[in-house]
Curated annotation (Swiss-Prot):
It is found in: Cytoplasm, Cytoskeleton. It is an enzyme of class 3 (hydrolase). The gene is TUBA4. This is Tubulin alpha-4 chain. Residues 35-61 are annotated as: Disordered. Tubulin is the major constituent of microtubules, a cylinder consisting of laterally associated linear protofilaments composed of alpha- and beta-tubulin heterodimers. Microtubules grow by the addition of GTP-tubulin dimers to the microtubule end, where a stabilizing cap forms. Below the cap, tubulin dimers are in GDP-bound state, owing to GTPase activity of alpha-tubulin.
Length: 61
């Protein structure tokens, strides 16, 4: 199980934080009690992350 802690300061921070958590729950299928249904793994589970483009295309910074 993964854990995530977020700290929001002030009224605007709390409102933005609530909106973000609502979006995260909708996108990832998280229920109101914080649990993810076992049969609704979205995006391949914990092992899959999008880290941008793969490979070296000769980009230099």
């Amino acid at each position: 199980m993964r854990e995530c802690i977020s700290i929001h300061i002030g009224q605007a921070g709390i409102q933005v934080g609530n909106a973000c958590w609502e979006l995260y729950c909708l996108e990832h299928g998280i229920q109101a009690d914080g649990q993810m249904p076992g049969d609704k793994t979205i995006g391949g589970g914990d092992a899959e992350f999008d880290e941008g483009e793969d490979g070296d295309e000769g980009d230099e910074y």
